[in-house]
């Protein structure tokens, strides 16, 4: 296991979570009844992506509305990217960041988890508001 992955696991455990490693080698954890993935990328880069995958399925005919909601959220939420994933059938969200040390990693992970914890509710609210316009 890489030093980077070990540090991320250690920080998540320190924060009170029980992270696991999936078959692809990604870190996953449960947060507010959601499965969150931590994608570590290159070992030599102090950069990670925290992802809430496929939290909304796109119904036929709502593609334009969903794209507008994703754009609005990505524009308004600091740190978060909300986007239609590669399948064009689901919406996912990520928080991507660089960190300088273990303390910064912990702070950024805490903020990312908090943000991803509410992104689904904010998405639904924005979708309702935009569909009424």
What are these regions (language model features)?
Residues 26-28, 46-48, 89-91:
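Hydrophobic residues embedded in beta-strands of well-ordered beta-sheets
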Residues 1-37, 84-85:
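Charge-rich, low-complexity N-terminal segments
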Residues 32-63:
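Long, continuous compositionally biased terminal/linker segments
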